[in-house]
Amino acid sequence: MPKVALIETKPSKTNFRQEFDGAFEFDQFQLCSNPTIKKVLKKDCDIEIDSSLYDWIILVGSDALKFFTKINSVTEYSGKVVEQKFLPVINPAMLAFKPEARKTWEDSKDSIIGFISGTKQETFVDESIAFGIQDTATANAFIQDAIDYDYTHVALDSETTGLYPRDGHMLGLSLSYDGEKGAYIDTECFDETTEALLQELFDKKTVIFHNAKFDLAFFQYHFNFNFPQIEDTMLLHYLIDENPGTHGLKQLAMKYTPYGDYEQPMYEWIGEYRKSHGILKEQFSWDLIPFHTMKVYAAMDSLVTFLVYEKFKKIKQNAKLLWVYDNILIPGTRFLLNVQDNGV
């Protein structure tokens, strides 16, 4: 059995062995040994632990997570693997005053037990499932494969140099047509055949976006593509969860796919690049990222969009939600595109 440590903020009455159903043994630690301190600061932490002795380290709550990693949101990462050995989890004590978090706790508990027991494996992202294309012939062949594939839909995403098509251009597009792989295609390799094949694809298939209003603006403005049938996973999520800050592709990918925070290495690269070049956050643009650095993570965007849609399409089985989606949200997206482009 793997060697496991559990770290909470300070001594508490929570019976973690019971909370985890006695599924595994662990050594228990606290960041701060003084239970009387209300808000534990870094200066209060007196924990002594050799993390190299443990295969898994469960981090209970945001304080422990922030102490050992660069991540702040324990709710977002609860039950996920961070940096290969850390397992963040919300504090089950919070359920007494926040019972709506019960499902998050139960799902996280099952996930952690699975990782520790070996019945659940971390899913790694590499070029076997997410890859880049900079060759015209290879790009055209991939798009033709998407056209010929027997699924009725494809997922599409774009990487751009700006927020608005008049201020920037498209660096590349990400395409997944089978839910098993995604490709990031450099727009520099497009020729007339590429554009014709893409339009044929968009005419034949339903195209799934995440935040379609953003991507459609660039595809229509720079390439004059038409999209007769679209879906939007962000809008589908709005139908079941109206809370702000919960609709990002990363959050949904972490919750509904096995791929977790697949973009984290790229954002670490961005942080190092900004630091070494003295660039402020607002001065950074995506064209500063080399293709070979971006390709895997950009390709993953369309793959996880495809997988999230597979989870969300059953939402449309609810007739009332379907009416809102088909008659308000999707038409509203197209209307806002016209307003953005032409004004009111």
Task: Please describe what each predicted stretch is.
Residues 55-62, 155, 205-212:
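Acidic beta-strand-to-loop metal/phosphate-binding motif
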Residues 11, 20-24, 170-172, 339-344:
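Short, intrinsically disordered, charge-balanced linker/junction segments flanking boundaries
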Residues 93-95, 103-106, 110, 116-134, ...:
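Active-site-proximal helix-loop-helix substrate-binding element of RNase H-like nuclease domains
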Residues 323-344:
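Extended, well-ordered alpha-helical scaffold/bundle regions in very large, multi-domain proteins
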Residues 6-7, 89, 154-157, 230-231:
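Short hydrophobic beta-strand that contains or immediately precedes a catalytic carboxylate
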Residues 134-152, 197-201:
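A short acidic-Thr-Gly-centered motif at the start of a beta-strand
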Residues 1-122:
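A polyanion-binding, active-site-adjacent surface
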Residues 11-12, 149, 153-166:
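Short acidic, Gly/Ser-rich segments with clustered Asp/Glu that frequently serve as metal-coordination loops
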